[in-house]
From Swiss-Prot:
The gene is htpX2. The chain crosses the membrane at residues 10-30, 41-61, 159-179, 196-216. InterPro entries: HtpX_protease (IPR050083), Pept_M48_protease_HtpX (IPR022919), Peptidase_M48 (IPR001915). Its EC number is 3.4.24.-. Keywords: Cell membrane, Hydrolase, Membrane, Metal-binding, Metalloprotease, Protease, Transmembrane, Transmembrane helix, Zinc. Pfam families: Peptidase_M48. It comes from Saccharolobus solfataricus (strain ATCC 35092 / DSM 1617 / JCM 11322 / P2). This is Protease HtpX homolog 2.
Amino acid sequence: MNWEVVKLRLNMALATLGITLLGFALALAVADYAFGAQFGVGLILSILIFIFFLNIIQWLFGPYMINWAYRTVEVTPTDPVYGWLYSTVAEVAKYNGFREVPKVYIADVPFPNAFAYGSPIAGKRIAFTLPILKLLNRDEIMAVAGHELGHLKHRDVELLMAVGLIPALIYYLGWWLFWGGLFSGGGNGRGNNGGLVFLLGIIMMAVSFVFQLLVLSLNRMREAYADVNSALTVPGGKENLQLALAKLTLSMDPEALERFKKKSTTNQMASMLFFTNAIEEVPTWNAKELVEIWKTTKVPWYADIFMDHPHPAKRIQLLDKVSKY
């Protein structure tokens, strides 16, 4: 077992456990202080039930909303134009031990992307946008499919939905404290000073943002783990996923190569937040050059702190460390 994989798994486990335990401990302590133990625990349970119900509804029926928003069309094995895409996903699914091939969709949107989603009702699904099919070759699409199917195999949606309850719990608890302190003059617990409870509510809502950053950090780890999955399960997955990442970056941000030559590590991350008119063709030699630059790029720890994906240079360097094929 590669040590980098072991370290990544350990970090993910510690992050998940740490966010959960710290979040619940903070919420219970604050609720007990402001409202007393009995009412505080009841309030936390009520908030959890509320946000859990909302998340479950979103999870179960979200795939149908995604299909509507992205104007997706399902690809069948006999599709005369995109049947190759279904067979590609089927091959990668076999490498990853799937009993059934996830449903394959093409999304009619103007930016290159691929994503995995699903629910017990909708089943497992993977979608590719039209621009990404024009941008990448079949081997690169296969590597991207290895990444996306890794999300389904590792149940990342369910895990992040569960951990995401923590910042929501802290925020709504802060909301209760805010209005409770503002109108009731305090709670029933030890912290019966209305002004203090009001201030505590503001602090808790701010703290929820900090916990959201922690969840984003976990999300980046899961994305890195999906990269690892592609490298370890798809033949040629490392090199092809690296090229795919470079092509996607250059498609959305043609100046990225020149900036990285100048040792800039932050500007391109901001530009990728916006959906611009993507370039449909990126020369492979440009992508290879960008990959080589990324391999030696030193990325500040804060470069991707607000992002849900790791900085691409970090992804390239991790793939080099864990590749099997």
